[in-house]
Amino acid sequence: GMGGGKAFAGGGKKEKRAVGSNFGYRKEMPDGMKILGEEYRTDRNGETYPLWKIGEMKSPAGEDLLVVSIPNLTDKNDYESWKGFIETFDRAYLENKDKWEKGRIILDVRGNGGGEDKPIDHVAKRLYGNLVNTYKRCEIKDTAVSNAFLHCHGAYKPRNYERDGLTAEKLVKRKNFSGEDRVLFDETAVYYPFNDKGGYHGRIDVLIDRGVGSSAESAYTSFYHHPNVRYVGENTAGMQQYTQGSFAMPCGYLMRVGVTKLTYWDKEGENIEVKGHKPDVDCRGKDAFEAVLQMPRDEGRILGFREKNEPVKGREVFT
């Protein structure tokens, strides 16, 4: 939490709000859980951590559950890095679609601070049967300083321009800046509708907590338009974007600086930065996975479709 007794996510009073750690970190699996696939990575300190885990089991009420745990998003955002996850999920889901339509899919991203969004994006598109709506929009104040920050973080990084066959001398640098706000990209203009024929009509439970930030928050935004989704846990961090650069300060700390305003929109049409996303079922004090196992199938669930985030400005597009 921040100072003054305030907690970071949601700005409420500092209080115990744990909803359990991600399923991927569990040492002991629930009775009857069959693991279909999992991958681990090793950090620079030699510690092993889970990247993803997919398994199936039955709930106490006898429902078939497909459990998809993504505790970390540390790999690159390409197919090769997530091939094991994609193939395991597709095999489990596509070969038993009817079974899961009658049952439930549980997506656990608790504690995931972000990185890349490939596996979440894959599951979201597969279950939607179309591209998904994230309502992402990014602006920058067009000044020399903010552009320098942005490009040093991206296009001016040697590893990025060298990959395109460029050298430092070939980079073109702008001299004139408007000083006004400029939109870098805007994904709010096109609405992708749910694919009634190819999409998933069963139940989805997404487990979230205060540790969910940056691209892991796309587990909220990417599933917002799916039917029959229930978010369970606690408020997310509301940190869609961290920063564009960092400086070492004399005291030894790093100061991180952001120059762009990246916004995602929630159902009220407000930017969720700092505010975060609220769950449908707040289960603070209980493990969210245990809570959804015990909870009636549709308790607190929005059945069918939620209201669209914003009025559909553009055209509906099937891909």
Task: Annotate each PLM feature.
Residues 293-294:
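Juxtamembrane/interface motifs at transmembrane-helix termini
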Residues 117-290:
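Conserved acidic, small-residue-rich alpha-beta core segments centered on
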Residues 1-140, 151-156, 203, 218, ...:
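Flexible, low-complexity junctional segments that flank or bridge functional domains
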